Amino acid sequence: MSRRSLSLWFPLLLLLLLPPTPSVLLADPGVPSPVNPCCYYPCQNQGVCVRFGLDNYQCDCTRTGYSGPNCTIPEIWTWLRNSLRPSPSFTHFLLTHGYWLWEFVNATFIREVLMRLVLTVRSNLIPSPPTYNSAHDYISWESFSNVSYYTRILPSVPKDCPTPMGTKGKKQLPDVQLLAQQLLLRREFIPAPQGTNILFAFFAQHFTHQFFKTSGKMGPGFTKALGHGVDLGHIYGDNLERQYHLRLFKDGKLKYQVLDGEVYPPSVEQASVLMRYPPGVPPERQMAVGQEVFGLLPGLMLFSTIWLREHNRVCDLLKEEHPTWDDEQLFQTTRLILIGETIKIVIEEYVQHLSGYFLQLKFDPELLFRAQFQYRNRIAMEFNHLYHWHPLMPNSFQVGSQEYSYEQFLFNTSMLVDYGVEALVDAFSRQRAGRIGGGRNFDYHVLHVAVDVIKESREMRLQPFNEYRKRFGLKPYTSFQELTGEKEMAAELEELYGDIDALEFYPGLLLEKCQPNSIFGESMIEMGAPFSLKGLLGNPICSPEYWKPSTFGGDVGFNLVNTASLKKLVCLNTKTCPYVSFRVPDYPGDDGSVLVRRSTEL
């Protein structure tokens, strides 16, 4: 072939190798027109459905690694990557078996390699900058710039679809009260299989309420936590006015009161902030903290007290190191140190416990310094819904020899002071929490929370559970029995929804069969982990500009962050050191070590 012929063929070959330009497609011809074609969720692999005219659509497959009318044809590298990637269930099996192998891995550089892989793979599943919100099912400047909104991972179900969940399922969703009573209400207490205790439950609730603060006035699509991450607004308040009321303005410290020789949060008489207590509770009995609802549970006020003491303790250490610093610098630097301590404890103890992994998780921001990573986070509505873990709550609360019902426990303003921090930490560390997944484990006192979440998801028109599984790289379930792993609940779900592709997001998470020896199912892990890790490592203190000793007041402050632990947090702020762990003491690994399941080891 001549050189001229080659020069003519080469451009043609290039054109053949390029993915075809998406064409505008007609909707399913079997359905009477006009039906919004995006109601069928035709675009796969994160392709974006764009409607044209009444019944035409086009899938935007840009940078998905796929092409074709519905983004289903993988590019060569995508195909190769998918072929080599292990399934989530196999990965989970590897990480939770072979204890002695992981002991070796954790002692070598392989731990950091795997940790970097975990962080990047998980975090890349979360779009940054944010994409959608409750008012905009398309990319908009408002979705990016207005931090009053929760972001959304998937756009809402189009309003003009044949059924509430798109095109599948019944014309009307099941009665939410009936759904909750049949499938979520506890028959008998099912304990968490990992030995999880209610100290873990209270830590989770206290920690997450700094960024889950849905606006009652503006609606469920809006948040009052404008920091969208770990900013400790639940300690310092979510606005400057509240913060100023809580500060002592001396040596960087927060206001406090001394009761029976111990430090506790101030009363609302001493710090004039709004706290939500029942009518009739006198102001001197209302403790003032950053989050206005923490008076609800003694467990929440317990952690508020511990973090208050930690803040003032760190202020003393910094004051000794930097006698020339003024109140403002002491306060601001201490806040950064406590943010670092929080992230350290959450990753290395809280998430470690949840995962059940033998891989020892590590908080080390430098692992991501060479990766493409955005140090900014936006809380998603789906993350907020996912994190309603009220099955953790027991039937009653045991403190010493005394058993408290919900009626006695809620808004109990004297329990914390009467027992003291040490006694409550010890008691909560010894009481089993409930299993989250698998269904039928909501105590009737908290069942209304599940009802409210489902109602909110319907108002916000969240897409079906299976669409979220696909969004996070999981295979959609093909039947209710595959979802639940048993026949009875599957039959009830079939009766209620009619189609597995019409199952709602939150019920799907709560009714999915649990992973072996796990507190919940595959979807909760595979969806929750990316949100969590992106939010934690996306914090500004983890960026190259912030992550250095000078940010934290020098080596003393930096060392506080790098050596933080749950036990230190409690025991450095109490006169005696109680039993403190996220696992009950009569469970294997109660000393904080990783649980060894010898019967199932490789």
From Swiss-Prot:
Signal peptide: 1-26
Disulfide-linked positions: 38-49, 39-161, 43-59, 61-71, 571-577
Species whose genome carries this gene: Mus musculus (Mouse)
Active site: 209 (proton acceptor), 387 (for cyclooxygenase activity)
Pathway assignment: Lipid metabolism; prostaglandin biosynthesis
Reaction catalysis annotation: (5Z,8Z,11Z,14Z)-eicosatetraenoate + AH2 + 2 O2 = prostaglandin H2 + A + H2O; (5Z,8Z,11Z,14Z)-eicosatetraenoate + 2 O2 = prostaglandin G2; prostaglandin G2 + AH2 = prostaglandin H2 + A + H2O; (9Z,12Z)-octadecadienoate + AH2 + O2 = (9R)-hydroxy-(10E,12Z)-octadecadienoate + A + H2O
Pfam families found in the cross-reference section: An_peroxidase (PF03098)
Cell compartments where the protein resides: Microsome membrane; Endoplasmic reticulum membrane
Regulation: The cyclooxygenase activity is inhibited by nonsteroidal anti-inflammatory drugs (NSAIDs) including ibuprofen, flurbiprofen, ketoprofen, naproxen, flurbiprofen, anirolac, fenclofenac and diclofenac.
Record-linked SUPFAM superfamilies: EGF/Laminin (SSF57196), Heme-dependent peroxidases (SSF48113)
Free-text cofactor note: Binds 1 heme b (iron(II)-protoporphyrin IX) group per subunit.
Membrane topology category: Peripheral membrane protein
A GO molecular-function descriptor: peroxidase activity
Subunit structure: Homodimer.
Protein's recorded name: Prostaglandin G/H synthase 1
Enzyme class of the recorded protein, top EC level: oxidoreductase
